[in-house]
């Protein structure tokens, strides 16, 4: 029988319910801090408030408070929004913080216990630039052993072993750093052995997802157990996206709620809107790809939580799905994207 490994133990896939496949509830994103524009320096250095929130929304990575998604205030705000997520029909959250993002399993376990939402934690490595010397020196064999151990044996949290339920997010820049290639290859090798799900984070270049999949597939990983994240900020042309879809992995639109006139992490492109995300997903559905689509928010800064004026983890369910229904998407198609596809991806299938 297939199972899904949550931080509180294994469950059958049908118990997951509606699932967000790419979120964070506690991580350190300070590596991506950007100095504020001189004209707004004082506003972005100030504490986030109603009078500064407009500046933070425009320049989210220029507020140090905003990218510190691990302090007590952030954790309280995240818990409040997870409870709202549950209230509006959410069942499970896949927490994608990996080595380099300072994944906090203790917090994830506490949130699972206190909210009743299923949490699935990931193993894997973020980009090379965010690794310490010990992690950055690991070989493919050592990485494979580590990922296998985190999934099979688990990690000790307050005297109990907590098992990871997938490999991810495995992140890379472009051109892909040698260490990141090792991580992708290790993920492919272990996926083949364990039958677990894998989640990839590509750089903000159209070629990156194709190269990641080549390395992963060559290492033995199954395409139908791999998610390519952040495609709504990576491949903007639908025809190119359809070409990428031929590789057989999951197509994930996971930046719902991110609507900005200036995308700080890639200033050469315009971030698409939620309306455009819906339109693109509908085009993919019409091409027969509904069984390969996933949706999420990738919340990783405070200003996206409701306590800071944001949309919270329930945004897709309360604001996006009604718009999709109004445009002709069926209940069955939504259930496929939010319930069935996540369960199929997360289920261990050796």
Swiss-Prot record:
The record's cofactor note says: Binds 2 divalent metal cations per subunit.
Q: Which UniProt keywords apply?
A: Hydrolase, Metal-binding
> What is the required cofactor set for this protein?
a divalent metal cation
Q: Where does a divalent metal cation 1 bind?
A: 22, 24, 169, 298
What biological process terms from GO does the record include? catabolic process
Does the keyword section mention Nucleotide-binding?
Answer: no
Q: Which InterPro entries does this chain map to?
A: AryldialkylPase_Zn-BS (IPR017947), Metal_Hydrolase (IPR032466), Phosphotriesterase (IPR001559)
From what superkingdom does this record's organism come? Eukaryota
Residues reported to bind a divalent metal cation 2: 169, 201, 230
Do the record's keywords include Transcription?
A: no
Q: Which CDD domains has this protein been placed in?
A: PTE (cd00530)
GO molecular function per UniProt: hydrolase activity, acting on ester bonds; zinc ion binding
Q: What is its EC number?
A: 3.1.-.-
Its family remark reads: Belongs to the metallo-dependent hydrolases superfamily. Phosphotriesterase family.
Name of the protein described by the UniProt record: Phosphotriesterase-related protein
Q: Which organism is it from?
A: Drosophila ananassae
């Amino acid at each position: 029988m297939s199972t899904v490994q949550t931080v509180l133990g294994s469950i059958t896939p049908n118990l997951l319910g509606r699932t967000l496949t790419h979120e964070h509830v506690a991580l350190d994103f300070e590596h991506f801090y950007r100095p504020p524009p001189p004209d707004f320096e004082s506003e972005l250095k100030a504490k986030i408030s109603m009078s500064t929130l407009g500046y933070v929304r425009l320049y989210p990575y220029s507020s140090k408070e905003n990218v510190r998604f691990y302090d007590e205030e952030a954790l309280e705000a995240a818990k409040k929004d997870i409870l709202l997520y549950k209230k509006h029909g959410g069942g499970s959250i896949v927490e994608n913080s990996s080595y380099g993002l300072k994944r906090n399993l203790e917090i994830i376990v506490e949130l699972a216990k206190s909210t009743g939402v299923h949490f699935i934690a990931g193993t894997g490595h973020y980009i090379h630039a965010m690794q310490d010397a010990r992690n950055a020196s690991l070989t493919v064999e050592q990485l494979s052993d580590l990922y296998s151990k985190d999934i099979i044996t688990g990690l000790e949290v307050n005297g109990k072993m907590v098992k990871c339920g997938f490999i991810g997010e495995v992140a890379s820049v472009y051109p892909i750093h040698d260490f990141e290639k090792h991580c992708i290859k290790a993920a492919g090798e272990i996926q083949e052995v364990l039958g677990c799900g894998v989640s990839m984070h590509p750089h903000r270049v159209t070629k990156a997802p194709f190269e990641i999949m080549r390395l992963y597939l060559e290492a033995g990983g199954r395409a139908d157990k791999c998610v390519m994240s952040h495609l709504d900020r990576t491949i903007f042309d639908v025809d190119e996206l359809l070409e990428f879809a031929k590789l057989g992995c999951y197509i994930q639109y996971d930046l719902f709620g991110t609507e900005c006139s200036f995308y700080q992490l890639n200033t050469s492109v315009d971030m698409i809107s939620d309306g455009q995300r819906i339109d693109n997903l509908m085009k993919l559905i019409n091409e027969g790809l509904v069984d390969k689509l996933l949706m999420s928010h990738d919340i990783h800064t405070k200003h996206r939580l409701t306590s800071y004026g944001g949309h919270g983890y329930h945004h897709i369910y309360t604001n996006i799905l009604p718009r999709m229904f109004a445009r002709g998407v069926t209940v069955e198609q939504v259930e496929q994207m939010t319930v069935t596809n996540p369960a199929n991806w997360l289920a261990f299938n050796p």
